[in-house]
From Swiss-Prot:
Bilayer topology: Peripheral membrane protein
Cofactor: [4Fe-4S] cluster
Protein name: NADH-quinone oxidoreductase subunit B 1
Principal EC category: translocase
A GO term for molecular function: 4 iron, 4 sulfur cluster binding
Organism name: Chloroflexus aurantiacus (strain ATCC 29366 / DSM 635 / J-10-fl)
Compartment(s): Cell membrane
InterPro entries linked to this entry: NADH_UbQ_OxRdtase-like_20kDa, NADH_UQ_OxRdtase_20Kd_su
Amino acid sequence: MAEIDPTQLELERQGILLTTVNRFYNWGRRSSIWPMAFGLACCAIEMMAFGLSRYDVARFGAELFRASPRQADLMIVAGTVTKKMAPQVVRLYNQMAEPRYVISMGACATSGGPFRDGYNVLRGIDLLIPVDVYVPGCPPRPEALLHALMTLQEQIDRQKLGRVRWYGSGDKPQTGDFPVPTFGAKGLEIDGKLVDPVGGLPLLSPYTSPSHGEHRSGQIEHPEVVRQFPIMDPEVELENALKARGIAPEIAADDLKRSVVNDA
């Protein structure tokens, strides 16, 4: 065990603490994380419980849920992100001041969850904005979200001012807004280009960890191929196998059943 410098010990007794700029700045940021009051689906109910007195999130300085993105620095994406809602999520993220962080709460926000093969659900919010911490579960318990907050604090403690994207010394800080998609007739579009078609596969790769510069990984999780799903019910026959592309077999079977059900 290293011995404590007697000079430093004497200074601490007099109320003088020696530290670095990075450590002092990170201490201030991690001790005052203000989440945005923003919920999408059932995970938001667990997020509400997370903010109640039972879990005492005030211990970590994150008890002030703000109703405006201008006053928040943490977005908790709690719930299913539909393709119609995705542009609003990106717009809210762009309105948050730097430094800003994102926690993807639950299976739906992370990868689409049980609605992954649905025509209207985004397969992970990290396709559009960078995510700092992922919380698995459907839905995650408040304790899991509390652990995600602690994990985020640990990440903040390891940051250095000279390397984060939103701080620049000489060069311009990289604080540009992320492109806001538009929901068109064929799906999500960015700058007029289709990036996530309705009922199809996403054509853009997710963002890597913000600690690596928030660049896209360059790898598309699902290559653009024609998938032919088997139908679970042998009584259901597909006239065209391509009709089930991008749809789970159960959904395809149910859709076909509805078209042949008799009223009698």
